[in-house]
């Protein structure tokens, strides 16, 4: 399945919530009407079946983290095999992706931009270049911008944008050095309450 390259706000309208696909700090609902579906007439969303609600939640989370369908299913399988709460395990796997950590640290304005930075070999983990967006970051790993990439305007712009947002408590970033420490694996209480991972578990359990 190809990665979606169309309008970002259209996806957020489809899911009825901000998917954090844009780089600005302004609330997305000031730019578009989230209560109506995308399209010329923007028809109001119809009530979904139980399956439809579960499917929408899965699509929402998949799009937030920018993961393809096959990758997402594999993450779910890994989460189900891991001891503990399957839904929380799934979110942990998504949060520890390198592209997501780069975004959380503010080196990329969006997860999509952060994924590009990783793919273009602009990011290092513990002093070594890593160009795999799905690379799993572990607690106490140090993530940094490669020295020759530190002059990139988009990275500087992203840091300026991230300075207006509150940094997650599980990362510690030195903007001057363009370096951050992934202090710990985030707990469920650290993450968005607008995600209902149990719906995803119910969907895949059928």
UniProtKB/Swiss-Prot annotation:
The keyword RNA-binding applies. GO terms for cellular component: small ribosomal subunit. Part of the 30S ribosomal subunit. Contacts protein S5. The interaction surface between S4 and S5 is involved in control of translational fidelity. SMART domains: Ribosomal_S4, S4. Keywords: Ribonucleoprotein, Ribosomal protein, RNA-binding, rRNA-binding. Belongs to the universal ribosomal protein uS4 family. Signal peptide: none annotated. One of the primary rRNA binding proteins, it binds directly to 16S rRNA where it nucleates assembly of the body of the 30S subunit. The keyword S-adenosyl-L-methionine does not apply. GO terms for biological process: ribosomal small subunit biogenesis; translation. InterPro entries: Ribosomal_uS4, Ribosomal_uS4_bac-type, Ribosomal_uS4_CS, Ribosomal_uS4_N, S4_RNA-bd, S4_RNA-bd_sf. It holds the Pfam family S4. Residues 96-156 form the S4 RNA-binding domain. GO terms for molecular function: rRNA binding; structural constituent of ribosome. This is Small ribosomal subunit protein uS4. It comes from Shewanella pealeana (strain ATCC 700345 / ANG-SQ1). The gene is rpsD.
